[in-house]
Amino acid sequence: MKASVIGATGYAGVELLRLLDGHPEAEIAVITSESSTGEAIASMYPHLSGRIEKNLQSMQELDAIAAASDVIFIALPHGHAMKIGKQLRGSKTKIIDLGGDYRFKDYHVFEQWYKVKHEDPEAQAVYGLTELFRDKVRGAQLVANPGCYTTCSILALVPLLKYKLIETKGIVIDAKSGTTGAGRSLKAGSLYCSVNESFKAYGVASHRHTPEIEQIYSEFAGEDVVIQFTPHLLPVDRGIYATCYAQLKQGVTDAQIEEAYQAMYGDEFFIRLRGKGVCPELKNIRGSNYVDLGWQTDKHTGRIIVMNCIDNLVKGAAGQAVQNMNVMFGIDEAAGLRQLPLVP
């Protein structure tokens, strides 16, 4: 498979290059950057030296890029992919968008939260949370890769919603992200002196991943679900940790909870069910496509607390994109993604 990456110099883009380089059936075709056109990617990211010796191109010759590619990954901020997708409508080239442009069934929700007019509302995109929508991804031409917070948060509670074990009201998600989640562009809040030895909430009651999580929760619950979602910035490079709180329905047992998780995830290669009373740790998923999930019930409040963590650049972005590519092309779903986490 010939794979091209549009927006190859951002954190998600360069992570795609790392994973594609180690993929047994993928060949990197074209890599682009509008701000660094003509430069060698290895000069910007020396860890790629000797492995990926390609120069960055402009994406202006989009039709030519598509002709040279079996699949195009778009790793650009929101607002760009919809233009690319619209231009390539009818092309044989498959598209996987790592941004937010195609994640919503109702494009008006996108416009409300992203404050951008959607330019490709007629697109037929599949939401690419692979473990939940594998069959749809398999036949897709355009896949919307989920967000990092959303992947972690959705996987945490969907089994409990599907099997009607928790109330749909009062769900609270307290999530934390490493600084790479904010992207590579220069921001005062992402500077070393701002992040180091500090911890803060941001996007309170306004984060764009909120409606994305609600959309999938509602689909599995069979009714509208509204959540309280608060993200925080951790002084670490990588990782997403979501602590999710929900009220258990009357009479629900620990055995039913475990059965629900096993029913949905027991055979999933990348989801590691740690079980009751186990608190997952970011260090155990770093650099990998794994999802580590643990939970505990609180008899005092009648709530369940689900703790879930992923690497935001792998399962939360590039890794899941490669996983979707594998499914789209009918090859081993774990191809190129079997790396163990980096410990220490």
Predicted regions, residues:
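C-terminal substrate-binding/catalytic lobe of Rossmann-fold NAD(P)-dependent oxidoreductases
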Residues: E27-D63, K169-G170, D174-A175, T179-V306
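N-terminal Rossmann-like NAD(P) cofactor-binding subdomain of oxidoreductases
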Residues: M1-E197, Y202-V204, Q296-H300, V343-P344
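Conserved active-site and cofactor/substrate-binding residues in soluble primary-metabolism enzymes
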Residues: Y11, G79, Q124, T151-L155, ...
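Short, well-ordered loop/turn and helix-capping segments at boundaries between secondary-structure elements
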Residues: G22, E219, V327-I331
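Glycine-/small-residue-rich active-site loops that bind phosphorylated ligands and cofactors
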Residues: Y149, K249, L313
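C-terminal helical cap and adjacent loop that interface with cofactors, partners, or active-site loops
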Residues: A263-Y265, L282-P344
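Predominant activation on well-ordered alpha-helical scaffold segments within soluble catalytic domains
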Residues: L17, I154-L161, T210-E214, E258, ...
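Short glycine-rich or small-residue beta-strand-to-loop segments that form or flank ligand, phosphate
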Residues: K2-V5, A144, T243-Y245, V306-C309
